[in-house]
Amino acid sequence: QIEYDYSVAKAFTFATILFGIIGMTIGVVLAFQLAFPELNYLAGEYGTFSRLRPLHTNGVAFGFALSGIFAGWYYISQRVLKVSLKESPFLMAIAKLHFVLYFITILLAVVTLFMGITTSKEYAELEWPLDILVVVWWVLWGISIFGIIGIRRERTLYISIWYFISTFIAVAMLYLFNNMEVPTYLATGYGSWIHSVSMYSGTNDALVQWWYGHNAVAFVFTTPIIALIYYFLPKESGQNVYSYKLSILAFWGLLFVYLWAGGHHLIYSTVPDWMQTMGSVMSVVLILPSWGSAINMLLTMKG
């Protein structure tokens, strides 16, 4: 009998609840500000829409959603791979360090965004010191993923694990490329030490930004959530996954198509016409793997 260790999963679950409440409360405040613009000025500059919106989007995406994803990983991975974190003191230490650095990063993000310290790139507002922290704990999560896979007893990788791996690889690539920036003080000796400018400019900056912005949604709100559903839905419903082959087909379809669809954020802009067309076409094609996963889940519930 394997004795699983859920301490890290519980810590991330606590963070999910905390950041979810904070992020969604700010979202409600923003909704009221849109209806009643005078509410923008009740707390001075710190209560304006422009200060609160990055807090809401980052809080929900990278606070609430990522916490839940990490909690799911540290719970699901042990069970489907038939291995406990207790069996590896190294992986346990990595998991705990992952949580601590992650939590510190989110708290620092709240402070800096409230202060108006931002790169001004949507969903990538965090400045370069925090970007470095994000990279560190993302690498720690990667060590956890491949470390647990490396010591597993169950040789077959369940579909949920595939989705977690794709999330790690895709977000790592997207985040690194989009957040390539030059700290202005280190480069010129002038200005604030925390300020930076993007390594890209003009149309190129827009292309990289929305390649990231679109796929941050794909690989934070889609693939890991599907991973959670493919574990908990059969578990709670008592039904087998309707079609395991369909889950694999939808997985590869989603990975191939989603990465090309970011161009639909730049319609009628200065990016090349062929890229706008490709982004639009791939967005329509995306119906197939998306519905493939959705139909598989619905038929699983039907039994």
Protein language model regions, located:
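Cytosolic juxtamembrane amphipathic/interface segments immediately preceding
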Residues: 1-11
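Hydrophobic cores of alpha-helical transmembrane segments in multi-pass integral membrane proteins
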Residues: 10-42, 46-83, 88-116, 128-149, ...
